[in-house]
């Protein structure tokens, strides 16, 4: 079988199940987040004159961004990349099939990255969101920005200086992670493993950067739910593919590519190998997303969400993804789309029942 290794933040629950891996998962903080700075009554451990301006004894969050003139490995993700590179060398020597998971933290908050990545961008030239307003008739359940409000140095999302700094920090973090991924891929090439290794790059969510006035991920808008997915298969022609895929589709896809039997009746996902072979192919009609009390269905044309209280719908939104990519107009009241909306909501309820079984 495969020798499986985990580095960094692979799952949100950092403690991982030990029996999922061939060896203990590697974390920069071996004990998860670490009690010393997770317990509010121990905040004095890292208090100093500088940090005292930002420390909140209950949340223990400093500023939402940082640009320090340091090496890549001063921050966590640089060390994750170097550990992954070391593992590639070790796995090559072991001469076994392997699955190596490399979990980077950024571009998650706080937006901390070495200064050289901030220097790639001129803050005054960064374009701010063209739609910093809340769409009309958007359900009250659609909110965001709560996470960033918990950081020190935060003033208001309406402040242009904040917007430019936050967006600058996000860009810097993306470039920082891009560089770390590049180091890992370069080592894969150097070791002669690239032509026998499948690479999957994904992010677990999107992020609002001022669109609709939001700065975060906690809602069912497209900026929060659409995430990167890049797959490199040896000898497979590159390109951009359309269609609808979900992260639950990755496992059956890898099984098919590696000729590993798929557990019968145990998977919700569907292989998207046909899309990798022909970008015009489709493998499924819908993607389903759930956040708190909201349920979202996404097709190639529409994104529809409902919020339920018991069996009653207490909030609705529908966006036409072809004519309104930015999701500026909630079409829930559109008479011309009534049948489409009804069908999408039916599919949501069917999926919800399936998941509750």
Regions from the PLM with identified roles:
Residues 14-39, 75-135, 189-198, 339, ...:
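Active-site regions of oxyanion-processing enzymes, predominantly non-cytosolic
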Residues 1-73:
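Catalytic-site neighborhoods of secreted/periplasmic enzymes
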Residues 28-39, 43-46, 205-211, 217, ...:
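C-terminal cap/loop subdomain of S1 sulfatases and analogous C-terminal strand-loop tails that border
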Residues 110-116, 186-236, 243-246:
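Histidine-centered active-site microenvironments of extracellular/periplasmic hydrolases
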Residues 148-165, 173, 312-314, 323-326, ...:
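Long, internal low-complexity/basic segments
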Residues 78-92, 155-197, 257, 339, ...:
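A long, amphipathic alpha-helix that forms part
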Residues 8, 99-106, 198-203, 230-231, ...:
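Short beta-strand segments
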Residues 73-74, 137-139, 167-175, 193, ...:
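A short beta-strand-to-alpha-helix junction
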């Amino acid at each position: 079988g495969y020798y499986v290794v985990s580095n960094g933040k692979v799952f949100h629950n950092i403690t991982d199940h030990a029996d999922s891996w061939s060896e203990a998962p590697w974390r920069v903080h071996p004990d998860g987040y670490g009690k010393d700075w997770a317990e509010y009554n121990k905040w004095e451990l890292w208090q100093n004159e500088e940090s005292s301006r930002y420390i909140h004894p209950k949340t223990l969050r400093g500023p939402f961004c940082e640009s320090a003139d340091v090496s890549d490995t001063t921050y966590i993700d640089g060390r994750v990349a170097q550990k992954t590179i070391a593992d590639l060398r070790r796995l090559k020597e072991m001469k076994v099939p392997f699955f190596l998971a490399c979990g980077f933290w950024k571009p998650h908050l706080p937006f901390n990255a070495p200064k050289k990545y901030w220097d790639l961008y001129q803050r005054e030239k960064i374009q701010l969101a063209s739609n910093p307003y809340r769409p009309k008739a958007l359900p009250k359940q659609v909110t965001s920005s709560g996470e960033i409000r918990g950081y020190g140095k935060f003033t208001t999302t309406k402040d242009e200086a904040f917007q430019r700094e936050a967006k600058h920090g996000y860009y810097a973090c993306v470039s920082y992670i891009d560089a770390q991924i590049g180091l890992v891929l370069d080592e894969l090439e150097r070791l002669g493993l690239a032509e026998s290794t499948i690479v999957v790059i994904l992010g677990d969510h999107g992020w609002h950067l001022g669109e609709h006035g939001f700065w975060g991920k906690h809602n069912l808008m497209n900026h929060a739910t659409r995430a990167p997915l890049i797959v490199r298969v040896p000898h497979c022609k590159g390109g951009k593919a359309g269609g609808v895929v979900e992260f639950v589709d990755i496992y059956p896809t890898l099984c098919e590519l590696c000729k590993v039997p798929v557990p019968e009746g145990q998977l919700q996902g569907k292989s998207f190998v046909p899309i990798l072979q022909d970008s015009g192919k489709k493998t499924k009609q819908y993607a389903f997303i759930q956040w708190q009390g909201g349920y979202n269905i996404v097709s190639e044309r529409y994104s529809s969400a409902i919020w339920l209280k018991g069996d009653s719908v207490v909030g609705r939104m529908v966006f036409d993804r072809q004519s309104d990519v930015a999701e500026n107009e909630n079409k829930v009241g559109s008479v011309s789309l009534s049948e489409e909306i009804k069908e999408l909501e039916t599919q949501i309820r069917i999926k919800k029942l399936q998941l509750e079984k």
